[in-house]
């Protein structure tokens, strides 16, 4: 498994044992990105408690600093302060803005920068990000008058953005994508007239909740499709943001706790935004034993502690209708399916083919190496579970969610495994491997 550009030896993953205890997962990645972005274009100071100190939000912070925004050092457990420059105060940077591995950073930056009239920006990223499609953001922005250029007709980074005075419009997004929607809402803040974004189904709504909290003139409605309207001209005001734990990171513990004999885990302070809880719906459908403890509301976002204990699971079948609320959880659910007696089916998941990796192909390939019975389809997979997985030489193929999913699978295998490029987990959960050891019993 060479050619990774990494010198790290494969991580040894021991089979067997159980997991018990309490765990706090890192701050929600979506909310971390947005609190930095909205704080940067607000007036005054924004404080962020619980910001995820992982590679993707660090990329967003680095881009904002390059445009004159003062952001305090981002450390684990520290409070981050952002000194806002106002809705049109971002400076033209002297260097290329490096988005690292973060598709969220690049897509939201396109919306943020498209309306900076008279300023020029270049966005780039790592080899993986340079392969990810960006036209899905650039094309609707163009209907507002934005100018985005790049390889493959503006689809692939590096991307050049020439800031323009944008015009408000009504835009339908072809897919329910929080990143596309959020980019358009950011662009709408400095347009000449109101903008309405219509999405075919609801995607994650962190941007709407948070922009309203920061003071944007934003309304949500619509009978057919979901309409989000922004009237430009409002001044955003700095806020104190408390970032809940990321349910996409909690998902690894939820599935591990449900699958592993003797497991009893409590995951503290997890964001339970209804646009993100598809994983809980599917685990409920499977018969998993999950309790929501101490439900509460923190800064407009529902939060709770989740307790999961081991029990028998049934196979599942889910598709397009629930996909926006669990798109990042498909890799770990594919692991769960391997241990359910019977056939599980995932469909409507073609979006996973353009994530950090082709996640459908990578999960099928790696689980098959452990002996799983999987058929891959264009938009999903069929998994016939109930046969034991065996330890194997595995590879995250540089994908953080694949790395952690395989870490759970390896605990349940017959025989030990090794995992190449396990350090990919740091993109969203830097302490994952340490926590796995701590909870092990």
Swiss-Prot record:
Gene Ontology CC terms, in alphabetical order: cytoplasm
GO MF term set: 3-phosphoshikimate 1-carboxyvinyltransferase activity
Chain intervals for the UniProt region annotation (Disordered): 1-24
A biological-process GO annotation: amino acid biosynthetic process
Top-level taxonomic group: Bacteria
Pathway the protein acts in: Metabolic intermediate biosynthesis; chorismate biosynthesis; chorismate from D-erythrose 4-phosphate and phosphoenolpyruvate: step 6/7
Binding residues annotated for phosphoenolpyruvate, in chain numbering: 29, 103, 132, 179, 359, 401
Positions of 3-phosphoshikimate binding: 29-30, 34, 177, 179, 328, 355
E.C. code: 2.5.1.19
Catalytic activity: 3-phosphoshikimate + phosphoenolpyruvate = 5-O-(1-carboxyvinyl)-3-phosphoshikimate + phosphate
InterPro entries: Enolpyruvate_Tfrase_dom, Enolpyruvate_Tfrase_sf, EPSP_synthase, EPSP_synthase_CS, RNA3'P_cycl/enolpyr_Trfase_a/b
Primary subcellular site in the record, as a coarse category: cytoplasm
Function: Catalyzes the transfer of the enolpyruvyl moiety of phosphoenolpyruvate (PEP) to the 5-hydroxyl of shikimate-3-phosphate (S3P) to produce enolpyruvyl shikimate-3-phosphate and inorganic phosphate.
Name of protein: 3-phosphoshikimate 1-carboxyvinyltransferase
Species the sequence originates in: Synechococcus sp. (strain CC9605)
